[in-house]
UniProtKB/Swiss-Prot annotation:
Its EC number is 2.1.1.297. Belongs to the protein N5-glutamine methyltransferase family. PrmC subfamily. It catalyses: L-glutaminyl-[peptide chain release factor] + S-adenosyl-L-methionine = N(5)-methyl-L-glutaminyl-[peptide chain release factor] + S-adenosyl-L-homocysteine + H(+). HAMAP family: RF_methyltr_PrmC. This is Release factor glutamine methyltransferase. Substrate binds at residues 184-187. It comes from Buchnera aphidicola subsp. Baizongia pistaciae (strain Bp).
Length: 277
């Protein structure tokens, strides 16, 4: 079977489960053949080997079952950087780039700042910040050991030495003070489980869903973060688009000042910031 024939075949198979069947087919081919998509399109007359077809059809079946494309090719781009991912880590979303963007703004007047990333996953937030601010010391923590392993591999791949990763359940192993804490915690409620896209359910439950109608982890972070923040230090938390008022109320309850909420690139409330007095 030629490349162009497999692309047509795969695209038809993926129409029921993917919003971008043509792109998905090209990405899978690129991964198996270890060629860029431009090469694939330009050389679609080439015949695929038997081994190629075996590998492609295994991946195609998994994608037809709604498994995220990032888990199939083991990589996801975030902040224009490539990140290894696995089913033990949340897949980085474009919405989260607003958290990085705002963190960099609040760090602008600080040199050699110490930053903590709570629930680091594959390390996308910590490493994005580290790549932009080589003078800063970034620590990423996660309760899943495999996530720490993957985040550490990403740091090596990106050759970033100003970041380290620690296995910890929130603040349980943290004994440092920081100029900033950032977090993209789980913030979906358990009741939302039945409404999310099927492919989201392939991602780790612990990284998606939280108690207290999705606000349990956020409340915990806001309540206990002050112990680890210097005076005038900042806390930035990502949350759901309907959670702004509740999240702001937690910041006020625990005596933060200069509280503000920022919208993501889809104009939805996404990140709330507060400063320790």
């Amino acid at each position: 079977m030629k490349i162009k024939n497999w692309l047509k075949y795969a695209s038809l198979k993926l129409k029921k489960t993917s919003s971008s069947p043509n792109l998905d087919a090209e990405i899978l081919l690129s991964y198996v053949l270890k060629k860029c998509r431009t090469w694939i399109i330009s050389n679609d007359f080439i015949k695929l080997t038997y081994d190629n077809l075996i590998d492609l059809n295994v991946l195609l079946q998994r994608r037809m079952n709604s498994e995220p494309i990032s888990y199939l090719i083991h990589v996801k781009e975030f902040w224009s950087l490539p990140f290894l991912v696995s089913n033990s880590t949340l897949i980085p979303r474009p919405d989260t780039e607003i958290l990085v963007e705002k963190a960099l703004i609040y760090l602008k007047n600080l040199s050699n700042a110490k930053v903590l990333d709570l629930g680091t996953g594959c390390g996308s937030i910590a490493l994005a910040l580290a790549s932009e601010r080589l003078d800063c010391k970034i620590i990423g923590i996660d309760c899943v050991k495999e996530s720490i392993s993957i985040a550490s591999k990403n740091a090596k791949i990106l050759k970033l030495k100003n970041v380290s990763f620690l296995h910890s359940i929130w603040f349980s192993k943290v004994d440092n003070m920081f100029d900033m804490i950032v977090s993209n915690p789980p913030y979906l409620s358990f009741s939302e489980m039945k409404n999310v896209d099927k492919e989201v359910l392939f991602e780790p439950f612990i990284a998606l869903f939280s108690s207290e109608n999705g606000l349990g982890a956020i409340r915990h972070i806001i309540k206990y973060s002050k112990k680890y923040l210097y005076s005038k230090a900042w806390l930035l938390v990502e949350h759901g688009w309907k959670q702004k008022d509740k999240v702001q109320s937690f910041f006020y309850k625990y005596s933060f000042i200069n509280i503000n909420t920022y919208r993501d690139y889809c104009d939805s409330d996404r990140v709330t910031v507060g400063q320790k007095q």
